[in-house]
Curated annotation (Swiss-Prot):
EC annotation from Swiss-Prot or TrEMBL: 5.4.99.27
Lineage: Bacteria, Pseudomonadati, Pseudomonadota, Gammaproteobacteria, Vibrionales
GO biological process assignments: tRNA pseudouridine synthesis
GO cellular component terms, A-Z: cytosol
Protein name: tRNA pseudouridine synthase D
Gene3D superfamilies recorded: TruD, catalytic domain, TruD, insertion domain
Catalytic activity: uridine(13) in tRNA = pseudouridine(13) in tRNA
Length: 347
């Protein structure tokens, strides 16, 4: 499988070390944080699961069968990796207030555990989470000193907030299909495919812009015409506030953003517009898809700064712990640390 992200720039250059990632499911652990409390009553049974080596959609479908409902009656806040040990909530629409007997379901699938149940007055929807906690083990690391040096840099300034390769499908197939749909003006009622290809299109253009900022030495520097993310919202940067915004960036009070392309004009001006616009112009097929679906322009921070980053070395293995906001990719952190050695998985 080719790496669709291989052309994108690194914060501190391509890693020196190599390592195995997800050599075992336990080497990639994810714990979902919804960030809100359940009401304790309502039409929806909330089920917290821990799954090993299974994807979210499969577990949801099997849980639906166990509850005697249709697959559409089970929902989630976020899809979790198959090749991992992950904890997340699923909601099941059971308006009569019943709690099914899960014993047969659990006996059939030893890779799935039910950790807790609750009740809520609303179903879960994609995006109903504030973030995820990660425990990631890199095994058979070839140059631990370089990895730890890079981790210190990550702790200081973060990493490029790239969308991970999973956003683009196997071998970038989602991106290829997004271009084809835009080129051929494909129309469909399949909301899942439409959403998947639109996400791939916008994510790729964003990644290219972030990479260009790294290549041009302005990943950690505001330029004239930028759009900053502040605690109050988005703010235009120009000559009048450039120095002040740079000082605030150093204090992590504001962040630089890049385009999530839409059918309206970029809000950037001057130097920032000159940097971003070429990546819009060079993808006419992706932009045809985006414009045809009336996606509105949005912004995303270009730096991913993990919270509570720590690590522990045992021999030639290193285990990282950190938290990320929803929508960010742990693989974007790992990419800055090591070159991945492919693992033949039996799970």
């Amino acid at each position: 499988m080719s790496d669709i992200l291989s052309s994108l720039a690194y914060l501190t250059g391509k890693p020196v070390a190599s390592a195995k990632i997800k050599a075992q499911p336990e080497h990639f652990q994810v714990r979902e944080d919804l960030g809100f409390a359940f009401t304790g009553e309502g039409e929806h049974l909330m089920v917290r699961i821990r799954k090993t080596g299974e994807n979210t959609s499969f577990v949801a479908n099997e849980l639906a069968k166990a509850c005697g409902v249709k697959s559409k009656d089970v929902s989630w806040a976020g899809l979790k990796d198959r090749h991992a040990v992950t904890e997340q909530w699923l909601s099941v629409h059971l308006p009569k207030g019943e709690t099914p007997d899960f014993s047969t379901f659990l006996a059939q699938y030893p890779s799935i555990e039910i950790l807790a149940t609750d009740r809520h007055n609303k179903k879960l929807r994609p995006g109903d989470l504030i973030g995820n906690e990660f425990v990631v083990t890199l095994s058979e690391v070839t140059d631990m000193a370089d990895v730890e040096q890079r981790l210190e840099k990550v702790k200081q300034v973060g990493v490029p907030n790239y969308f991970g390769s999973q956003r683009f499908g196997n071998d970038g197939n989602n991106l290829d299909e997004a271009r084809r749909w835009g080129r051929e003006n494909v129309r469909t009622r399949n909301q899942n495919k439409r959403s998947m290809y639109l996400s791939a299109a916008r994510s790729w253009i964003f990644n290219r812009i972030v990479s260009a900022r790294l290549e041009n030495g302005v990943f950690d520097k505001f330029i004239d015409g930028d759009i900053a993310q502040t605690s109050q919202g988005l703010l235009a940067v120009d000559a009048s506030n450039l120095a002040d915004m740079q000082n605030k960036l150093a204090l992590s009070e504001v962040e630089i953003t890049a385009a999530l392309a839409g059918d309206n004009a970029l809000p950037t001006q001057a130097d920032a517009l000159a940097l971003e616009q070429p990546f819009i112009d060079e993808e006419p097929d992706l932009m045809a898809l985006i414009r045809g679906n009336r996606m509105r322009h949005d912004r995303r921070e270009i730096a991913l700064k993990p919270k509570d980053l720590a690590w522990n070395v045992e021999g030639n293995n290193i285990t990282l712990t950190f938290s990320l906001d929803a929508g960010s990719f742990a693989t974007s952190i790992v990419r800055e640390l090591v070159n991945e050695v492919k693992v033949e998985r039996e799970y």
